[in-house]
């Protein structure tokens, strides 16, 4: 099985720069994309698409392309303030889970509020993942 994770930094731009060729060449079973920055019309034969865009335009968001139908798919953590940013998709398959995560960024210019947001995100994500069956 081939699983690929890729921060595309904007799917529309990435698509213009060889995204579909990469898929055709690499042939991953699952492709997890982060920072899609909104929905972009995409038809990829042989793949099911699972979108989780941010509510804010041109911001964050995740996408999973899968050759197989998962048993279930969950978007987000179930907490609006985190889920509004489209940062997580959880795919359940028969013998495993795939969790596609685009974690909130922190840098030296981050506000104290954003630091608190990230610290809480990390705690909630850890709890979420450890509770997966």
What does each model-found stretch correspond to?
Residues 115-133:
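A long, amphipathic alpha-helix that forms part
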Residues 6-13, 76-77, 116-119:
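Short, flexible loop segments at the rims of nucleotide/cofactor-binding pockets, characterized by
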Residues 25-27, 75, 96, 125:
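Short linear sequence motif anchored by a di-proline
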Residues 36-38, 42-110:
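Structured beta-strand-rich core segments of catalytic domains in phosphoester-bond hydrolases
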Residues 15-16, 84, 125:
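Amphipathic coiled-coil/heptad-repeat helices and related helical stalk/stem segments
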Residues 1-44, 54-60:
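N-terminal, active-site-proximal structural segment of metallo-dependent hydrolase catalytic domains
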């Amino acid at each position: 099985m081939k699983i690929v994770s890729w921060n595309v930094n904007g799917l529309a731009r990435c698509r213009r720069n060889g995204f579909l060729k990469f898929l055709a060449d690499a042939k991953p079973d699952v492709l997890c994309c982060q920072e899609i920055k909104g929905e972009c019309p995409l038809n990829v034969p042989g793949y099911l698409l699972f979108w989780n865009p941010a509510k804010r335009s041109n911001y964050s968001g995740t996408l999973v392309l899968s050759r197989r139908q998962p048993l279930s798919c969950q978007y987000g953590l179930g907490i609006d303030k985190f889920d509004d940013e489209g940062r997580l998709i959880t795919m359940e398959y028969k013998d495993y889970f795939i969790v596609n995560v685009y974690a909130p960024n922190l840098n030296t210019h981050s506000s104290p509020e954003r630091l608190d947001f990230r610290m809480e995100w990390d705690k909630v994500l850890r709890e979420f993942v450890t509770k997966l069956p």
